[in-house]
Amino acid sequence: RMSATTRFAQYAAAENFHEEVRIKADLLVQLTAGKGDSAPEVDRIIREDFIHNHMVDFWRGRVAFDYEWNSKDQTYDRDLYAFRSFFEAGVIDVGVIVTRELSNDFFKSLGNCLDKFGNETDKTVSAKFGASTTGTHKLISRIAAGRSGGCPVLVLGILPGNITPD
């Protein structure tokens, strides 16, 4: 049985999205003295690794895309900062996050986990999706607080009624 994350990656690949795309950039700062385009340069500073190693799950054209099914608060922060870095560097026009709305009742309804042989274990499925797991409400509050900079972000929150055990 394929995990939702693996299935999602296959769909993205079929649509020609590149997976695990990283951005790195140096910054060139030029200081000029005087007015106008002909003002002489008085100093030049290069800041290496100004943007260093931010990653998005998927990228194609002007869109960065992240899939966060069992996200923690800090994961959203990382994703929004990556979107911001890609956007400010002129690489993307929009970031998209697909996540789930809190649906812990659904996970509780699944009962116990199975081992690799299909035998029920003592651990519940819902234990993986505990109190530290967040949903769209935490993501929206982070976007409202400006964590994505000027990058527009489209959030798709999958509701509990749209999830089936199949």
Language-model segments: what does each one mean?
Residues 140-166:
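C-terminal functional extensions of proteins
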